[in-house]
């Protein structure tokens, strides 16, 4: 019998040849189905955490909960568009099932409704308030941290898991989305769960894990449709390549995953498609009331290409974009100009500002460059995206390469290497898509890349410490420290108005010291340890050496995490409301602007300059406080001031991250207008109707009465038609029409509705808002 020792990932890898048979003992953290011993490392990571590990896990979850819940009500209802849909779902089961914006079931939100259901149930139980709307998403964030921790711990150990959880919890865009009611919080949890289930399938070979993987992906599709597909390549690699099963089993399990995915998502799509359109709400975001078009177009290929029915439509397609005769790029240029020079002024008395000649409020095309800059290989590091998720992106890539190399000659089916590969493919798929997609690219989309980035950083940190005796490991680890610190320095320097001027320099100094100290760890140990008489170093390090090591690790952690921590603290301390949000301070260009069909502002003219009345900081009819770069403000909408925490606005009525035309904000509805809309509201199906879901949502939340969102999110969907609206008015089902919703008119039927109302009913002005009583026609 011969024995050879080969260094592998996680420890020594021994091979024994005996009587012609070859037996392989798998290194720590790398067991396969054939070697699932309950001793040593595997016993530690497969069982429930105990002792210090349990204490660390609890501290991690409590810290995450603190970050995601502290002063959560500062964000009021978050995104009114989704909050109103949750409110509607709490009052009507049909609205709950379809995700209707109103419980009269006029039109749905522009997503499948799974992410709305937790908050709808919370509102039903606890009533409508900030906590019932937002707390479910904070809990989804804590669950995401827990699932990532459990996944990394099982295959890479508790240290890697703890670091991974910290990175996920401190990344600014994750803090933003786990304190907000967009679908992204649920999407992140379900994608992380899908990776966990796939890894369990690779480890055990049991079919139930393959099925569960597909279920998580399918549910993710019902949360945010096409974005969940970003994890599919990683799952394919794990199930079809990394898995140690035979090709027949791998093929069968892959097909089982696909079948489970189709069933768990398809049941809803088919049910809606087969449901009689007369007994369900219009499918928001589609041009023909079709769930298929919403799925494949608006939330599918159009997001990538910028063509078709992407959010905001083409020029002239909805509020806040380029008017007819102007291009989407003109809209973006004009939006940035309005944001940067603060020259846009609100229309007086709650009226819309002047429109550019030849156009009504436009859609803004795909809007990608407006929110996140031009597509390029460096897009993730530009002014708009650099502070969101990519603080440790380069470090994660370095960890990926280092980790795979450290796995050495361990078999491909090695589960630790499999996790490295799965996380790496997921991260690269997100990075490539977000860098080059031509369609609408909001900054907060990047939250989907945070779990794989955090997992790779955590695993890389643990491996770097375990193999710190290797020169090349220390060298690449020092490079990861340097790139992370320099990235943090650059991002904070760009936002110097919002942070102490000394902070980026402290991070830079800590980066240099930390990288040098890490590289010099072996020499520190030899120099600081007490030696025996023969000159040898004892196995137990002296207190001095231990102190040096702790200091080095502390400086490294500060260098890598101080930047994202500062951005996250800023995000927590400032209100985040509206449909265009971003973590950290507002950038001077690109935040908000035309393109996603959101309300607010008017379209630039064909030359790209903001028209008179184009409001860079406020909404039509609301005061314009000329917010500064550090305000991240989008001030009041019709009929309300921008200061005060009433109605559906956040504290101070501020909306961060949307300072240019098209950046939708929240409004504070005056008490007088609230009373008017509530007047005899129990006698009508809708207390009021107005153009666009965003404005309607704010009125609905403020009054707790049903408000019809004509035209849906963009204000341009054909729901209801003019004839349908006339019929509802004649049947006395709508009490008021609010002319100033902040979204204005849109081409087609909705402009016709506004014109018809103005022609047949008398206008009254309430606190700057034009309101028509649809029960009182003009005298002929």
Give names to the regions the model predicted.
Residues 1-308, 324, 333, 342-475, ...:
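Membrane-integral, polyisoprenol-dependent glycosyltransferases
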